[in-house]
């Protein structure tokens, strides 16, 4: 509230069941969440329903190359590791987002965010990897020291690890 002032409000809710009347909102924002919806079409239908005719829907998502270097590093260490049980970008990503949004919105603009990270802290990277939603704990849990040494070696040899951030913003109008 301190940053936004009194002219703005936000609500956290289930996009698949929005408890507001038709044409209620000027703007709806979904920041890296659409790929988690059980029923994406229902969520998009609800979002479109509650937007005013001149309303704007902003949604962000990842692309298929997002943090690909982390996946490569982990697979090179142990090919059995999957950092995610679901391929989120197949559900809703930069590559298929416009197609998925087009039944609900007339104008769709994609703005890609060209960025990367340079990681030079093996322990921080290891902690991030261990926080992912895959099977890495099963295969790395008893090998953490070995895995950290593997990361430290890569960081030392390359003066850090450059990690691709493949993200973007869809701006949609009804």
What are the residue ranges of the model-derived segments?
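Short, conserved SAM-binding/catalytic segment
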Residues: 1-8
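Short conserved AdoMet
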Residues: 5, 38, 52, 102, ...
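Conserved residues in the N-terminal Rossmann fold of short-chain dehydrogenase/reductase
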Residues: 12
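A short acidic, Gly/Pro-enriched loop at the edge of an enzyme's catalytic core
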Residues: 16-28
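A short SAM/SAH-binding and catalytic strip from SAM-dependent methyltransferases
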Residues: 26-41, 61-63
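A short glycine-rich, Lys/Arg-flanked "PGG" loop and its adjoining helix->strand segment in the class I
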Residues: 41-56
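Conserved class I S-adenosyl-L-methionine
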Residues: 56-83
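Conserved Class I S-adenosyl-L-methionine
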Residues: 88-174
């Amino acid at each position: 509230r301190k940053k936004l002032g009194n002219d703005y409000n936000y609500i956290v809710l289930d996009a698949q069941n929005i408890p507001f009347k038709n044409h209620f909102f000027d703007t709806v924002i979904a920041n890296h969440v659409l790929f988690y919806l059980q029923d994406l079409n229902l969520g998009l239908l609800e979002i479109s329903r509650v937007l005013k005719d001149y309303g704007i829907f902003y949604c962000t998502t990842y692309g298929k190359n997002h943090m690909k270097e982390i996946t490569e590093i982990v697979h090179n260490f142990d090919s059995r590791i999957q950092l995610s049980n679901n391929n989120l970008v197949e559900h809703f990503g930069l590559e298929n987002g416009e197609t998925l949004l087009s039944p609900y919105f007339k104008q769709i603009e994609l703005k890609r965010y060209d960025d990367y990270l340079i990681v030079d802290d093996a322990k921080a990277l290891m902690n991030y990897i261990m926080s992912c939603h895959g099977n890495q704990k099963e295969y790395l849990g008893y090998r953490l020291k070995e895995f950290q040494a593997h990361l430290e070696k890569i960081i030392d040899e390359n003066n850090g690890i450059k990690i691709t951030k493949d993200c973007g913003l869809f701006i949609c109008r009804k």
